[in-house]
């Protein structure tokens, strides 16, 4: 997977090498490898979800969002123009651990990501501009780039379906 300008920042190229595995395993192999040892009948994150609900009920929003970021929960931020959505996003991004691989998808470069393992991808809003790809195509590309997190700055039109 190679992403070059203008889909990424000028002066950067993102290269992700994917190697297909020649190994073919059956269920017994997966069992011996311990794949099923972490499977639970109920949700894997019951404790985290309960803690999030408790923080919400207590109105402890700072702790709520810290835990949500730590637990890699999807967070949707919405509001009117000028209401602070981007500023709030930047505050949450600071909570992401430094070792994680972060990909951003934006039509206008707004997000500041202090973590070093990051790729900023850009698309043309409404098909205008040098980039010939949209958010949907960049999202598909991002999934092949082994991200820990994908930060999609604006979600509009049918792209929401794919996210």
Model-derived features: where do they sit?
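Conserved glycine(s) of the Walker
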Residues: 84
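Conserved Walker
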Residues: 87
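P-loop NTP-binding catalytic core
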Residues: 1-70
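Switch/coupling sub-region of P-loop NTPases
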Residues: 62-80, 91-163
């Amino acid at each position: 997977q190679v992403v070059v300008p203008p889909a990424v920042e000028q002066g950067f190229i993102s290269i992700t090498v994917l190697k297909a595995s020649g190994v073919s395993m059956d269920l017994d192999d997966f069992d011996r490898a311990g794949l099923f040892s972490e499977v639970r009948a109920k949700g894997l994150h019951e404790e985290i979800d309960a803690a999030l609900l408790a923080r919400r009920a207590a109105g402890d929003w700072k702790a709520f969002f810290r835990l949500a970021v730590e637990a890699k929960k999807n967070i949707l931020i919405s509001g009117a123009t000028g209401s602070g959505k981007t500023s709030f996003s930047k505050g949450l991004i600071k909570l992401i651990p430094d070792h994680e691989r972060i990909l951003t998808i934006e039509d206008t470069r707004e997000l500041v990501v202090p973590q070093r393992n990051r790729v900023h991808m850009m698309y043309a809003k409404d098909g205008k501009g040098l980039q010939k790809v949209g958010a949907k195509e960049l999202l598909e590309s991002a999934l092949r780039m082994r991200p820990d997190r994908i930060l999609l700055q604006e979600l509009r039109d049918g792209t929401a379906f794919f996210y």
